[in-house]
């Protein structure tokens, strides 16, 4: 079949790869001049199935109130008159119960664990290089209260068969020697040895090149305007290059997916949650992280990417704004310098932001819609890199009429109709 994918981020490009491998003729459309130039460009670099957790969690409403008064707050809510923002936040609050958290986290871990397996297989098949490291991730806790609260996560990890280690501060410093001078600032950590790290932009651009060699057509610098419906199906998509027809269409437009499907009468509860990153060159090897260290207090992930350190995180609900406030850069730099002082050259920091497409329950939306030839692959939030290969493989199986290797009944948009 002829399949047209809307969006050339990591989710769109991996979808193109697996669909092409399944024998379909694939076209990818994106408004940018190349792949991975928006949310996939400079994310935190984690491939972390075990840390796949919804932001909607017990205690978050109270924490959000406290964060309002923090200098380096991990969550910022900008005043907005956008009803979609308030509707999304209301739905998110309804997911902040222990019962909903357990359900949502189990869904997310299911997709993320499968995705890591798919990434491993793809790496073995292609030899793709993206500054990857397979040395696990470490979440560090600065307070005893944070450390004591990991029980609910440990329960889900245990139930899912995900290996983990609970470490004291000395154990954290043994895993990440660069933490040793700052170890008194933490009380302990949770390590997931099966997690990986890597540069999402490098991966996506290289996979796009491989996909093109495999016959995928990429139409860059092409604006996507509206779907054309005929007989209950999407006949074509109107673009700045004219009408593009296909047998199947896949919306992998990240935070812009709701705008596209709204024209079809579909309500997709995906909203942009802005995240930030800084990237600095390593100047002191002995102080640099080995892999990824997640700072629970500031919700910042500090990752080694080759000869660079990438610090990414925070969450800002500010619509589609892409401004870069100096205060956000200060927070990222503070987290890096506080734990890995002097490891990177902050004077050469490259500051970036991206709009993560978040669902209120944290789980991505993958699968069919009420239009027989329209599929969705979006809403991955902070985990687009982690979940991309698995989500794409699931999508390719669904479109090809094959049974996916994991349960997908609760991943489609239909779960919001209940």
Swiss-Prot record:
Keywords: FAD, Flavoprotein, Oxidoreductase. Its cofactor is FAD. It comes from the Bacteria. It is an enzyme of class 1 (oxidoreductase). It catalyses: a D-alpha-amino acid + A + H2O = a 2-oxocarboxylate + AH2 + NH4(+). One of its GO terms (biological process) is D-alanine catabolic process. Oxidative deamination of D-amino acids. The gene is dadA. This is D-amino acid dehydrogenase. The keyword Flavoprotein applies. Belongs to the DadA oxidoreductase family. One of its GO terms (cellular component) is cytoplasm. Pfam families: DAO. Pathway: Amino-acid degradation; D-alanine degradation; NH(3) and pyruvate from D-alanine: step 1/1. HAMAP family: DadA. One of its GO terms (molecular function) is D-amino-acid dehydrogenase activity. FAD binds at residues 3-17. InterPro entries: DadA, FAD-dep_OxRdtase, FAD/NAD-bd_sf. Disulfide bonds: none annotated. The lineage of its organism: Bacteria, Pseudomonadati, Pseudomonadota, Alphaproteobacteria, Hyphomicrobiales. The keyword Oxidoreductase applies. Its EC number is 1.4.99.-.
